Amino acid sequence: MRHNRHINHLGRTHSHRKALLSNMAVSLIKHKRIFTTLAKAKEFCKYVEPILTRSRNDTTHSRRLVFRKLCDKYAVSELFREIARKIGDRPGGYTRIIKIGNRLGDNAATCFIELVDYNELMLKTAHGGATNKIRRSRRSSPHKRDINERNNIIQEDNAMTKTIEEAKGE
């Protein structure tokens, strides 16, 4: 019986799941936003939140503990140098899951998972930027609406990466 097992195995062995979550964490630290399935994202939050909390205290011991999970020295240095500075005053909840819809091939629920303090578009709207209302026709099909929403999210993501690259260049 499966009593008291609080981990989603994601259909993988222990070593495969450990490698998957570690690689996803490195990608999130490097790119600040990743695209994945909802089940992986929910399990990934449980994995990465303690790592981000550990990075707030920059000691040799905490660096070694984080490196044990990530196994990428560039990701560890970026985590302690840049990300820890931004999340230093936040008491928790460093990641955000944005549901996108279902994948066309296998109908899996997909989402973006991102670091909360790195989404400039949401930060601008939260600090007083006006949002535009979306007007929808009654005749539009839900399938077309899902595709349009995905395209809008991808365009926003591309625009955000361009602004981040321009900011790094300056």
Curated annotation (Swiss-Prot):
Swiss-Prot/TrEMBL keywords: Ribonucleoprotein, Ribosomal protein
Organism name: Azobacteroides pseudotrichonymphae genomovar. CFP2
Family named by the database record: Belongs to the bacterial ribosomal protein bL17 family.
Subunit structure: Part of the 50S ribosomal subunit. Contacts protein L32.
Keyword Nucleotidyltransferase set for record: no
An annotated GO cellular component: cytosolic large ribosomal subunit
Name of the protein in its database record: Large ribosomal subunit protein bL17
Claim: Ribosomal protein is one of the keywords in the record: yes
InterPro entries in UniProt: Ribosomal_bL17, Ribosomal_bL17_CS, Ribosomal_bL17_sf
GO molecular function: structural constituent of ribosome
NCBIfam families (alphabetical): L17
Domain of life: Bacteria
GO biological process: translation
Signal peptide start-end: none
